[in-house]
């Protein structure tokens, strides 16, 4: 199947196969519709197949990796990939964004969790999913990756750059505090809730 390139991206119909060559580097791509943008972090592997109700986008010949999945509301979305990490940082107007921060590239395989059309790929069955109610707090010491919806976490979680995604420079003692309402996906250790700094009864 040959896809037609439009503005540097190949638009592929639902159910078609997408293939890409290995390229262990991050690629900053932007979709040409709806103003969505995201960091694409391939992990030395190929996109195997994409099935969705909408359209799937993959890069040009020199950037052959998937850049975004746009699914219709309440429609199942399936991503089949050997190793792929996607870190979106843009969201639809009036919607929450799913953010994924990879700390390791050596064990990535898909996890079937999707929110607002974005694919969250993780590590086999080691990813834990926690839904926090309003006012609840979750402290995580991540080993490999963290994804979340809602507010940004507090604690030792500085603003990330491309170099942080490619070459993680943070210590192993990262402790991130997530505050509900939100949903958190993570690989690592879940600790007892910690009161935010300056919190009083």
Stretches with model-predicted labels:
Residues 1-201:
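Phosphate/adenylate-binding glycine loop and adjacent helical scaffold
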